[in-house]
Amino acid sequence: MPRPHRLRAPFRALVATACTAVLGAGLLAGAGTATADQNAAPKAAEAQAGSRVVGYFTEWGVYGRNYHVKNVETSGSANKLTHINYAFGNVQGGKCTMGDAYAATDKAYSADQSVDGVADTWDQPLRGNFNQLRKLKKKHPNLKVLWSFGGWTWSGGFTEAAKNPQAFAQSCYDLVENSKWADVFDGIDIDWEYPNACGLSCDTSGRAAYKNLMSAVRAKFGSNNLVTAAIPADASSGGKIDAADYAGAAQYVDWYNPMTYDFFGAWDAKGPTAPHSPLSSYTGIPKAEYHSQATIAKLKGLGIPSDKLLLGIGFYGRGWTGVTQKAPGGTATGPAQGTYEQGIDDYKVLKTKCPANGTVGGTAYAHCGTNWWSYDTPATIAGKMNYKNQQGLGGTFFWELSGDTTNGELIKAIN
């Protein structure tokens, strides 16, 4: 199964022109600021600003990647996490639906695969990832789990959902709060890629659609559940942040996860090489606003409180091949070979396959042979944590848990 959250960027170049034509200059109209109303999100009590550590767990990782909920425990990651976002549920016919029901609720775990060392039985009412998450929460009572819906591949259904936000919210609530697993989940994460803009498909629901949908979700889930959302990091004028009313919708979320990674990559097959998750700008950066500081500054400038913004980090790298120049900005012949697909690989692989030998824009890069990769390391994450703290951000989130080493090198660098 494809990894729908992370793999949105290869299509960016293909859809950019079409997106502009479809959406036009109206993206900037009515550029609101954050406001409040009766359905606003309550102050989150379970984690103080700056302390949230949110990691995505991919449903399909239990197959080819052989990454299970038990690995969250054995790597030490569970001791660092405050929240897990379970990715992904689907959006179909205007409703929240299951992603892979077998992986989520039916896959049987042996004793050695299980979080608590107890094997599943054939007749128990719940198996799969959900039951393993239940066991993980029993070991870590303060750990919260949210069910994330959408992602790169499954966001097309949000267009239909936006036509009747209340019905969508009801369907999500009914699914998340199903009596078989209601105790597993503490809320919902909306990952719409992208409202009134283009991802794998183009949405033309209008600038207000996102605020209306998030209002309905908060109204249905109420103040006792968490409501969060992954949002774009494109801070350019007329870009994806301008396309929807993220400021107006901020009142309905406990926090936003701006996806400050995948800024650059081998979807531009010939280069120029550039780090996919720069913290800051640097001389020669291909697009001026494509870095985390620009994203955070733009969102704060819209009036979104700092403590409702988390800093995003990728536990993976992006790379090119056919590169002779060590420094960023070189030409390439195409994407570098990755373990599962071209142009991308996990940190746990890259740290030995192509060790970092340079830094730029607050992140690391590596030139080995004719391959050029960029990724974060424990050292560059430490620098990003300094920035997060200086800005008073609400914490850190990352994509995704299986990219880290077996002993959790990257998550241990997050404070």
Each PLM stretch: what is its role?
Residues 62, 348-415:
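Extracellular low-complexity, Gly/Ser/Thr-rich intrinsically disordered linkers
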